Design a protein with these regions (language model features):
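Domain-length cofactor-binding catalytic modules of enzymes
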Residues: 1-206
Length: 206
């Protein structure tokens, strides 16, 4: 959905900006907000289905987007802040996830204008997606990658994706969290160990 919105916008306006009070800008922002609402509902549906399979009950505690644009004032200047793979620091506790073979961290953000009111949204990649299978296929079969060194399980029917998202392709989450803590941007609260990871491209199968 987001890609379709972007494609239509670029086809119409190239990469030029739009006056924020124009009809075109308002139309784009309305589509942007609709995409965020769709993503929110999709996450809720996934969570509900997981709870149903576990025959458990639960309620949402965290729901944080990390690809969106919003009005923001920095150093007294009003403008628009685009987060592309960044977590807002003003919504309370957030999770900074590691790879499927590493811990994730629950952290308390420290609101900071210097960091554009944003935090890292995960460990970050070491390798490009296109090189992961070449690096790993001689060492691991897809079946072997369905178990991690931490004992957690991975459900993924896409043979390309399971290599692209392998733990080896990501940085250590501890190094990222330590950097944020040393910079005074977060207070670590809890360390979370993965139990089950579901990965899907939504269109491919084994």
């Amino acid at each position: 959905l987001g890609q379709a919105i972007l494609r239509r916008h670029v086809e119409a306006f190239s990469h030029n900006g739009l006056p924020e009070d124009s009809d075109d800008a308002r139309r784009y922002l309305a589509e942007h907000d609709d995409a965020l609402a769709f993503a929110r509902s999709n996450r809720a549906l996934i969570a509900r289905r997981i709870l149903q399979q576990l025959k458990a009950e639960g309620e949402p505690r965290l729901d944080v987007a990390h690809n969106f644009v919003e009005p923001c004032t920095v150093a007294g200047e009003a403008g628009w802040l685009h987060r592309k793979g960044a977590t807002p620091d003003g919504q309370g506790l957030v999770i900074i996830p590691g790879s499927r073979g590493d811990y994730s961290w629950l952290v308390k953000p420290v609101v900071s204008e210097a960091s554009l009111f944003s935090l890292a949204h995960g460990a970050g990649r070491k390798w490009m997606r296109t090189e992961c299978k070449d690096r790993l296929s001689a060492k691991f079969t897809p079946r072997q990658l369905c178990r991690t060194g931490m004992g957690s399980r991975v459900i993924c029917r896409d043979r390309q994706l399971i290599y692209e998202e392998a733990p080896q392709a990501y940085k250590s989450i501890d190094s990222v969290v330590d950097c944020l803590a040393d910079a005074g941007l977060i207070t670590p609260v809890a360390c979370l160990r993965p139990v089950l990871t579901l990965k899907t491209s939504g269109e491919k199968s084994a």
